[in-house]
Amino acid sequence: MLKPLGDRVVIELVESEEKTASGIVLPDSAKEKPQEGKIVAAGSGRVLESGERVALEVKEGDRIIFSKYAGTEVKYEGTEYLILRESDILAVIG
């Protein structure tokens, strides 16, 4: 499994609906990049200049909303993930 460093998290993307509310099927070219995901791994936190480590506010299993163009896409063992910093996370769902 991927283990992120510092204040980074690894998320699995949650795909958006392929149909609109009225039943129109959207082609891949019309879909926007997902902005929702589930955290599958979290780093140990960021280190302050004093050397003190600050734990992350999010944890494994959290569903999150993140900035549209944030993170780095990676493919690991056939699954696509996104690695991003905690500061790119906008909200935790639920």
From Swiss-Prot:
Keywords annotated in UniProt: Chaperone, Cytoplasm, Stress response
Organism domain of life: Bacteria
InterPro entries for this protein: Chaperonin_GroES, Chaperonin_GroES_sf, Chaprnonin_Cpn10_CS, GroES-like_sf
Single biological process term from Gene Ontology: chaperone cofactor-dependent protein refolding
Keyword presence, Chaperone: yes
Recorded GO CC terms: cytoplasm
Main location: cytoplasm
GO molecular function, one term: unfolded protein binding
Positions in coiled-coil regions: none
KW Cytoplasm (keyword) present: yes
Localization terms from the record: Cytoplasm
Pfam families: Cpn10
Family label: Belongs to the GroES chaperonin family.
Function (record text): Together with the chaperonin GroEL, plays an essential role in assisting protein folding. The GroEL-GroES system forms a nano-cage that allows encapsulation of the non-native substrate proteins and provides a physical environment optimized to promote and accelerate protein folding. GroES binds to the apical surface of the GroEL ring, thereby capping the opening of the GroEL channel.
HAMAP family noted in UniProt: CH10
Protein name, entry field: Co-chaperonin GroES
Organism: Bacillus subtilis (strain 168)
